[in-house]
Amino acid sequence: MPGSGDQKPYLSPSQIETYLRCGEAYRRRYVDGERIAPGIVAVQGTGVHVGAEVNFKQKIGTGSDLPVRDIIDASVDGFDRGLTEGWTVDPEGPSVGDARDEVASLATVLAQEVCPAYQPTHVEQTVRIELPGAHDMLGVIDLAADGKVIDLKTTGKTMTQGQVDKLPQITFYAAAHKVLTGEIANEVVIENLVKSKKPKRVRIASTRDKRDFSALAARINAVSAGIQAGVFVPAEAGSWMCSPRWCGYYDSCPYVNGAKTTIVDLHVPGE
């Protein structure tokens, strides 16, 4: 059971998202513990997050950002460390060299445009919200500053206002801010770093109210009930997620004929 042990089991925003996209993928990852190495695009995101974390953690005490070069180096180093743990090769994705260059470009935008905009109070802060049901909620806030919660996302396409307004993950962060500070976040912000020919920053702000929190609670209760009942419904056949490019379990999934298409291989350095 995910998040189990001596404490009450918990769900995270990413677990809820996985369960609702594909219950079978959730079962294999969080119930059976069958971990699949991330794609190189995910490792890129991890690298940029490392650069942001290194800068903002020291900024809490200093009030100043690190030099741009230091933030870039921290991001690239985070990317390289991520690769040492293995990654899933995508023939349609970037090469390692190109991916590393993209990380450096994204980190440049991060350092020049995002970092100067915030004086953080909390960075990469784990928050547990105790709930009356079978599961608590546990998540990590990227950044809190001036009553806001900020989440950094690297994407290939620009996110939309509609997406941000509805994201349950961001609703959780707004609630988690109250656990940290006693106040619900006055604004939730996505700092979207977009991988285009010229990487760009898009800041998308939103708010959350009681109806958003009620909707999140309903999702948590539904997912928790499904897990307790052992119900793990697979993704719809033909959905974007149900493909070898986006699901590492595809080739061995009992709900698809994985022999028809195989485009990914697991690469582990040194093997």
Predicted feature residues:
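RecB-family 4Fe-4S metal-dependent nuclease core
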Residues: M1-E271
